[in-house]
UniProtKB/Swiss-Prot annotation:
Mg(2+) 1 binds at residues 66, 71, 103. Its cofactor is Mg(2+). PANTHER family: INORGANIC PYROPHOSPHATASE (PTHR10286). It is found in: Cytoplasm. It comes from Buchnera aphidicola subsp. Baizongia pistaciae (strain Bp). Keywords: Cytoplasm, Hydrolase, Magnesium, Metal-binding. This is Inorganic pyrophosphatase. Its EC number is 3.6.1.1. GO terms for cellular component: cytoplasm. GO terms for biological process: phosphate-containing compound metabolic process. The keyword Iron-sulfur does not apply. Homohexamer. Catalyzes the hydrolysis of inorganic pyrophosphate (PPi) forming two phosphate ions. GO terms for molecular function: inorganic diphosphate phosphatase activity; magnesium ion binding.
Length: 175
């Protein structure tokens, strides 16, 4: 079985499957799943000595505005191995722009059946202010030393908007 066969979720948009590409707090290496092969490749080494504050991955069978699957940051008590699939619930979205255009980062936590620790978190407003600041700081600066790459942070949006973005990305994929 390859990652290409993974569904978008159990009950879209409230219950999603996220394919993890980069573990939280890991070395500054950008991994991406090759969409044709369904295998994890090293995309590039990030020249800024920073680590992802959360696990980073995507929802399969979605298409965002840049043509790639929809990006997701998953806050967990422990880092998740790249290539793993985790059942999640979205709680919000970080809206930003980069050199490719509008770029959404869905923020999710493990589904309560996977981890009870975050069961009281139902929206981005329930997430720790420190973690939200770390996420913004990371995305503001992780491309700083790369030529012709930039990021502009727009701000946070709630769970309802995250779910709309997920539904839209699923529809774009199936067109």
């Amino acid at each position: 079985m390859t990652l290409n066969t993974v569904l978008s979720g159990k009950n879209i948009p409230e219950d999603i499957y996220v394919i993890i590409e980069i573990s939280a707090h890991s070395n500054p290496i950008k991994y991406e799943v090759n969409k044709d092969l369904g295998l994890l490749f090293v995309d590039r080494f990030i020249p800024v000595p920073m680590f992802y504050p959360c696990n980073y991955g995507f929802i399969n069978k979605t298409k965002s505005n840049d043509g790639d699957p929809l990006d997701v940051l998953v806050h967990t008590p422990y880092p998740i191995l790249p290539g793993s699939i985790i059942r999640c619930k979205p709680i919000g979205v970080l809206n930003m722009f980069d050199e490719s255009g509008e770029d959404y980062k869905i923020i999710a936590i493990p589904h309560p059946k996977v981890c009870l620790e975050y069961s009281s978190i139902n929206d981005i407003c329930h997430l720790s202010p420190t973690l939200k600041q770390q996420i913004i700081h990371f995305f503001k600066h992780y491309k700083n030393l790369e030529n012709n790459k930039w990021v502009k942070i727009i701000g946070w949006e709630n769970k309802k908007n995250a779910e709309k973005i997920i539904l839209s990305a699923c529809e774009k994929f199936h067109k």
